[in-house]
């Protein structure tokens, strides 16, 4: 099998993957559940449910999985999921951790692939086992001990990729919250290079910093962030793969905001004129709605039909004196809530 285009870039476009499928020059891995895979998958894809890898993610186990899937050291690999890239990111990282060089994320989910009208199949390819060595890549992994040692270093940035309320409730001291949903753009699992660079710049994160990402437990959401950073050429990125669950179980220090609630999320709202570029579409927002001005009764009625959250409604709107940081309004005046 030949190497993929742009081997240093961890993302492959759906257009290029289609060409590689026709050439039969690539190993494609679908990390959805088996029953989902059986109902239809990208042509020539083999199945690796993420749970199988997470059940034992030791280097030896990852090596065996790779070999059983017909992956040798030289095999070009593309991985996809139907979960905004988080599950596939974790598998890409695992292969890179044992030293596999040519492995990439597909830039769309399976659903997006289908929406593009691209070919799918229910045929299961035959797999010829291969031989794969293990050459651990320690530079891409952070442990709890390492994180505790470097978290006070000014050249180290820790990013928490959980949803903001989880972050507010408790997080690793000094961590900056970049929720995983802010990493995507319309029709793709990740922002454009320019969009990602703008996000980092506006959060005050220098591109020459050492960046460590973490999430809740197994490194899926933070794995997506890891590759978002690598996709724009950030050289020194590590994944704290066992993430906050391990950190808390080890009784490491944590920071938290007492009595955190949904109003504390206001700092994550974006100006409506920018919303298509920086956030998911409004129908996907589950806990509120951003408006350019105080909502009319008609607008409230529309929202009640659109964005329920446990039977309660929250709207945030801008006044003239709202400060904007990274397109995020910091609410200074009114906050409306409707039951």
Regions found by a protein language model. Give the residues of each.
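His/Asp/Glu-enriched short active-site or ligand-binding loop at hydrolase and phosphoryl-transfer sites
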Residues: 179-185
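A short, acidic, amphipathic alpha-helical segment used as a generic capping/interface helix at domain edges
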Residues: 192-205
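Short hydrophobic beta-strand that contains or immediately precedes a catalytic carboxylate
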Residues: 17, 25-32, 48, 155-162
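Active-site neighborhoods of enzymes that stabilize oxyanions during catalysis
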Residues: 2-13, 111-169, 176, 251-287, ...
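Extended interaction-bearing regions that mediate binding to partners or small molecules
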Residues: 288-339
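Thiolate-centered catalytic microenvironments shared by cysteine-dependent enzyme domains
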Residues: 2-8, 53-145, 210, 215-245
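Short loop/helix-cap segments at secondary-structure boundaries that form the rim of catalytic
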Residues: 37-43, 167-173
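Extended hydrophobic/aromatic segments used for targeting, binding, or gating
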Residues: 194-195, 236-241, 245-264
């Amino acid at each position: 099998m030949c190497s993929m285009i742009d081997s240093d870039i961890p993302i492959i476009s759906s257009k290029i993957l289609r060409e590689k499928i026709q050439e039969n020059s690539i190993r494609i891995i679908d990390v959805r559940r088996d029953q989902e895979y059986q109902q239809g998958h990208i042509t020539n894809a083999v199945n690796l449910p993420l749970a199988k890898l997470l059940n034992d993610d030791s280097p030896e186990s990852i090596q065996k999985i790779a070999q059983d899937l017909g992956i040798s050291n030289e095999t070009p690999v593309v991985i996809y999921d139907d979960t905004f890239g988080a599950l596939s990111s974790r598998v890409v990282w695992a292969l890179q951790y044992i030293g596999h060089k040519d492995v990439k994320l597909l830039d769309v989910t399976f659903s997006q692939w289908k929406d593009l009208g691209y070919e799918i199949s229910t045929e299961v390819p035959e797999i010829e086992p291969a031989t794969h060595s293990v050459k651990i890549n320690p530079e891409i992994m952070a442990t709890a001990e390492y994180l505790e040692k470097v978290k006070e270093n000014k050249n180290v940035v820790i990013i928490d990729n959980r949803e903001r309320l989880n972050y507010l409730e408790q997080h690793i001291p000094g961590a900056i919250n970049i929720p995983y949903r802010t990493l995507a753009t319309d029709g793709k699992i990740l922002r454009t290079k320019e969009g990602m660079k703008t996000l980092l710049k506006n959060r005050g994160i220098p591109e020459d910093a050492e960046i460590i990402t973490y999430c809740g437990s197994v490194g899926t959401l933070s794995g997506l962030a890891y590759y978002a950073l690598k996709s724009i050429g950030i050289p020194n990125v590590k994944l704290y793969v066992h993430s906050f669950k391990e950190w808390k179980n080890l009784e490491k220090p944590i920071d938290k905001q007492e009595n955190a609630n949904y109003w504390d999320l206001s700092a994550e709202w974006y100006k409506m004129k920018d919303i298509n570029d920086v956030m998911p579409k409004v129908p996907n927002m589950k806990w509120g709605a951003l408006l350019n001005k105080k909502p009319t009764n008609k607008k409230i009625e529309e929202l009640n039909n659109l964005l329920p959250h446990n039977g309660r409604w929250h709207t945030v709107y801008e006044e003239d004196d709202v400060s904007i940081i990274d397109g995020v309004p910091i609410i200074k005046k009114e906050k409306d809530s409707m039951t």
